[in-house]
Curated annotation (Swiss-Prot):
Region feature (Disordered): 1-31
Protein name: tRNA (guanine-N(7)-)-methyltransferase
Domain of life assignment: Eukaryota
SUPFAM superfamilies for the chain: S-adenosyl-L-methionine-dependent methyltransferases
Function: Catalyzes the formation of N(7)-methylguanine at position 46 (m7G46) in tRNA.
Originating gene: TRM8
Pathway stated in the Swiss-Prot or TrEMBL entry: tRNA modification; N(7)-methylguanine-tRNA biosynthesis
Originating organism: Eremothecium gossypii (strain ATCC 10895 / CBS 109.51 / FGSC 9923 / NRRL Y-1056)
GO biological process: RNA (guanine-N7)-methylation; tRNA methylation
One Gene Ontology CC term in the entry: tRNA (m7G46) methyltransferase complex
Amino acid sequence: MSLTDDQASKRQAYRAAKEANRKELKHVKIDDALPNKSSELDLPKKKFYRQRAHSNPFSDHQLEYPLSPAEMDWSKLYPHYYDAATNTMTKKVTVADIGCGYGGLMVELSRELPENLILGMEIRVQVTNYVEDRIIALRTNHAAQKEYQNINVLRGNAMKFLPNFFEKSQLEKMFFCFPDPHFKQRKHKARIITNTLLSEYAYVLKEGGVIYTITDVLDLHNWMVEHLNMHPLFDRLGDEWLDQDPCVRIMRHATEEGKKVARKQGDKFVACFRRLPNPELV
């Protein structure tokens, strides 16, 4: 459905105002209420950030990425954890939400995992902008409690550039929530779980780290389980573990896509796999 001129004008004005606010506050260390700002920032409205549900991961999206993890400047994303005296970060990112969508999982994980830095990677421009604006508002509105300092988002293509951001064995958890199912067989190569990509995930995951997957598409669930089962560096975790892990509970209910599935009374298929030790060379 096309927008009227008035609707398009309102969307443009809203986005321009949010962009100005984003440029001002995106990299600011928000520890206390900011001067010259109202005490509360409105959370962004999704209707002004509409974009296609999925994006072609093989397209040239003109993304910015570091040549290596050593060249990544994390201080811009997590200024609260940057030590200016030593010019170093006091923590590293250890949790990644791949294809984070509108950021619902990260927001909930922020309180569940307060000692972890959590990064969402999202390829769509407007969705990334929404999450940035959401985090800015949450940080500002909870400045006194210093909450939500441990989450952020960047626009990136995890299928191409993941090792450019993360060192070997850096991550403890990776989440793949309701990824694009790519139903057509000729599109299966674009799925986020493949043999080749699993080897990259194994590289950035520490031993004992966990891959979390959830989807409402049974065919995709079976595909992900099959490929993870076949990979020598991953072992599936049982139902008892799933029932006890708080991140699984959050993953089921916190994401925007998960809430939509729940409203439609659809199924949610969950599978988690632990990163095994590297085999000893003989």
